[in-house]
Amino acid sequence: MDVYQISCDLRPGVRDAEFVTALNAYLGSLKKTGRIETWRLLRRKLGLGIPALGEFQILIETRDLAQLDEAFKAVSTRNEPVEGAHHGVNSLVTNFQAALYRDFPDPHRQLGEERF
């Protein structure tokens, strides 16, 4: 699995429940149409964490980069209904950062022949 990780904070005045509702609508639609496998929302607890990483973490899982690319293509059309759902989330957040991770070790990896 590949994991697209998003870190963000809420814009001033945005309620956390409003953010959750918008995120459910947006990522729920991507999951329902098979563009992502699953997603999770995490929130910093007890104020612990690296401030630069934001209060919220969104973990979006895809089977592989091909599925993630299809999700990006769907969103980048800027057509409804995905555009409205994407804007519904994007307009609520600030300090957006993203990263891409994979399960490790890779399931196809062979051990013993590495040269480094």
Residue ranges and their predicted role:
Residues 1-2, 49-52:
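Short, flexible turn/loop "capping" segments at secondary-structure junctions
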Residues 2-9:
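Active-site-flanking beta-strand signature of metal-NTP-handling nucleotidyl enzymes
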Residues 6, 19, 23, 58, ...:
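Hydrophobic pocket/interface hotspot
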Residues 10-13, 63-64:
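Structural beta->alpha junctions
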Residues 14-41:
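Short amphipathic alpha-helical segments
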Residues 29-37, 51-55, 59-104, 115:
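An amphipathic, aromatic/His-enriched active-site/gating alpha helix that lines ligand/cofactor pockets
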Residues 42-48:
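Short, solvent-exposed loop/turn elements at beta->coil junctions and helix N-caps
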Residues 109-115:
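Short, charged, intrinsically disordered terminal tails
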